[in-house]
Each structure stands twice: as C-alpha cells, then as structure tokens.
Design a protein with these regions (language model features):
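Flexible loop/hinge segments at secondary-structure junctions
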Residues: 1-182
Length: 182
C-alpha cells in the first residue's frame, strides 16, 4: 500500500517501467538481475521464466491456472456490489482480506469492463444497442467462459458469475432493466 493502486504507479527513483506485457518483458530481459510482472498468459506464450510469490500466510505459490482460480474464488467473497465503489479492490486481489488465502496466487486480478448503470446517458445509445451490449456481457460471463482455459485464463468462479449476473441485471436504459431475458 506504500504506492497505492493504479494502472500506472509512481515508483521510486531508479526503477524502470515498460509499456504493457511486451515492454515489461523486454526491460527485464535487457537488465540483469531485474524482476517484473507480466500476465501468466504472456509468460507462457513467450516462454518467459517465472517464479513463486509469497502469500499472506507465508506460503510460496507458483502461478498456475489452479492457483489463480483459488485466488479468484477466495477473493470473490469480498467483492463489492456492482453499483458500489470498487476503489478498495485495488489492482490485484487482496488476499489479506480473505479468511483462507492458502493455495491462491497472491498477485492475481480479474480482467474487467466498466459500464454505465444507466445506458441512456451515452450519446447515440439506443435501446437496441443497449440490449446488444448487455447480451454480450451476459455471453462473456456464461458461454464465453468456455474459451478461458485455452487462452491460459481462469474461467470465472461460480460466485463471480452470480455476482456478475446481479450486476448485469442492474443495467437500465431509460430507467428500464435491459436484461429482461435472464
């Protein structure tokens, strides 16, 4: 927490920052004895070596689909509602906030999308476009999970799917719920 939570953190002097997975990987490879963080998918696809990270309970955990899934499931119990502030969630799951973080990779996060709760505030938005967006979100949370493992991502835990369903049902257009089929 010394540096806060942000997509871009102001690190102390003497540190290097790369742009995205390719930039970070290149800097680490060019600078002996350096470490960096890239997505597991990127590391696997590019044969980049990676190591274990110490968890809040002192356990050293290797990043695998199983340890990422364990972290996601444990963290899902402390997620705020979809229409509440997510500022406290941070960039990575905070396994310090969960009862049993054992077996969870400690620097894991969800990929996410931010959507207005009331879609008619978006210029040019129509009921048809709102419905298409909400149907896409529903697909991503359900049928789209089929593709996760093949891309070295973890399918959403059941608790997160349920959480996302409730959030998607909150989306409205002109005050009317869009996801009327769910």
């Amino acid at each position: 927490n010394n540096f806060g939570a942000s997509k871009v953190i102001s690190w102390p002097g003497g540190t290097l920052g790369g742009s995205g997975n390719p930039g970070v990987a290149a800097l680490v490879q060019q600078n002996q004895y350096s470490i960096g963080y890239v997505e597991l998918t990127y590391a696997l696809q590019n044969n980049i070596p990676y190591g274990k990270v110490q968890s809040p309970v002192g356990e050293f955990v290797e990043p695998t689909l199983e340890t990422l899934a364990t972290a996601a499931a444990a963290s899902s119990l402390s997620l705020p509602q979809g229409d509440q502030s997510w500022a406290s969630v941070g960039t990575y799951f905070n396994l310090h906030k969960v009862a049993d973080p054992r077996g969870g990779y400690p620097i894991t996060s969800f990929s996410h999308i931010i959507v207005y709760k009331e879609l008619n505030v978006i210029p040019g938005m129509t009921k048809e476009k709102a419905t298409a967006l909400v149907k896409f979100l529903w697909y991503a949370v359900h049928e789209g999970q089929f593709y996760a493992s093949g891309l070295s991502y973890v399918p959403l835990p059941k608790e997160v799917v349920t959480h996302n369903e409730a959030t998607i049902r909150m989306i409205t257009f002109n005050g009317q719920q869009v996801a009327t089929w769910s």
